[in-house]
Amino acid sequence: MHDFDGRTAVITGAGSGIGAALARRAANEGMNVVLADIQETQAREIATAIGGDRALAVRCDVSDEASVAALADAAYARFGTVDLLCNNAGIVPGGRHRKVWEYGLGDWQWSLGVNLYGVVHGMRAFVPRMIAAGRPGHILNTASVAGVVSGSGSACYGAAKHAVVRATEALYAGLKEIGAPIGVTMLCPGLVKTGIYDAERNRPAAFVESDDPISESAELEAMREELYRNATTAEEAADIAFDAIIADRFYAFTTTAFDPAIRQRADDILARANPSFDDIVAMSRRDAGLDREPSASEPHAA
């Protein structure tokens, strides 16, 4: 996809972070922009800055199928077509670093609801309409480096992102099989300066783990700040995504720091070997240009 001027982008999670940066980049390319976010006020502020005639803010809970269907209806009613779909919304359940068996069911339901079903609902609501329009277009699904590496940490987040990777590969293959003029890019951010770790403020009451209150140590907060100082900016991530869209390239990574782990995982699978993996926090530190040994409680890549 090369011609953006006058066309329409729909971006979920557009109220902050990578989503907001994608919205601004789309607007700078001359696109109409539909900004979807559960935090409607933030989305409206960005839409106002872009310009009322070219931007529409919609409150949307991507974990809810009806909410995403309403988003699609609003986008088509306002602009008549959707040419670029960015299924970008994502969250990381907060609290202490847990092993896979320590996450509550609410953590799993919330993570899968936003990180996986948000993408599924977006594809179901928009892709058939984009195909029917017969216009060149593009779909960007935001996965994560956590979706292509192994490890014990951030299990309910990583599991959802692994599923997004597989779903996005299937989307790419399916569109190629029917000859649709729609490209697909899978964005896999490493450590990016966003508010993804602050998503607890938006956790639905139904998914709150009342028997396991969220708490994070001062050490963890300090470590996160250290990592973020040299992390990729949301604007840089958005530029990487748009470069891939323009080049019609499937994979878009914000860093090469995780390449050894990706290669090792593939080698282990082909060798039928037991998994061997580098700690994702250590890889995040390399991504941020830090070299001291990480503690066991450090945050994981977004």
Regions found by a protein language model. Name each.
Residues 40-41, 59-70, 105:
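The beta1-alpha1 cofactor-binding region of Rossmann-like NAD(H)/NADP(H)-dependent oxidoreductases
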Residues 29-45:
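Conserved glycine-rich Rossmann-like NAD(P)H-binding loop of the short-chain dehydrogenase/reductase
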Residues 8, 15-16:
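Conserved glycine-rich cofactor-binding loop
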Residues 144:
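Residue(s) in the substrate-gating loop at a strand-loop-helix junction
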